[in-house]
């Protein structure tokens, strides 16, 4: 296992809830909002932030930490134009760098290939969305094997999904429904059925 590299930092301020379009009654509840990330919107911008370090086996590794104030979770939208299949991509949080989601560059390329085979040639088809980290920070790490130059990487993170609802807690309505359901099942232990 490799030690997590020191991550460059990208910080977004608090999400203005006034700009969030809330869900209409009777429709699925909106729990997150797409946010533009100017600091990493292009491959050139992202490339300037990578702080490449040599790995023990002779490859290179770098990481970037994205922080969105007030978020209960983050998903990074990684726009892939060129990614070596031999690369390893990891997602974790700075608070728990040992809890890692890891995927090969090849697996990401196959997901994108399926999107394009279905007829979608847009940037959306070339975007891989990371899993939700469950907190307001997400670290994207890329490891390149020996012999693969950093210039072989052409990715950007133009957007992230800012989860603004705490999905581990019930909404007020869900809580009230739980309370009502509990009342139905309440009984006094001294009231026994004599049948």
What are these regions (language model features)?
Residues 1-195:
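Domain-level representation of secreted and single-pass membrane ectodomains enriched
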């Amino acid at each position: 296992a490799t030690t997590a590299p020191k991550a460059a930092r990208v910080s977004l301020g608090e999400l203005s809830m006034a700009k969030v379009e809330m869900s209409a009654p009777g429709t699925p509840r909106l729990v997150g909002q797409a946010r533009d990330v100017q600091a990493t919107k292009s491959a050139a911008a992202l490339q300037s932030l990578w702080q490449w370090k040599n790995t023990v086996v002779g490859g290179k590794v770098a990481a970037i930490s994205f922080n969105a104030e007030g978020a209960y979770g983050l998903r990074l939208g990684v726009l892939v134009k060129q990614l070596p299949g031999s690369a390893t991509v990891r997602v974790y949080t700075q608070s728990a760098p040992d809890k890692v989601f890891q995927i090969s560059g090849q697996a990401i390329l196959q997901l994108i290939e399926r999107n394009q085979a279905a007829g979608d040639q847009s940037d959306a088809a070339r975007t891989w969305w990371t899993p939700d980290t469950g907190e307001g920070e997400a670290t994207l790490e890329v490891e390149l094997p020996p012999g693969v130059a950093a210039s072989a990487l052409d990715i950007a993170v133009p957007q992230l999904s800012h989860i603004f609802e705490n999905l581990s807690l019930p909404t007020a309505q869900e809580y009230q429904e739980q309370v009502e359901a509990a009342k139905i099942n309440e009984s006094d232990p001294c009231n026994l059925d004599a049948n």
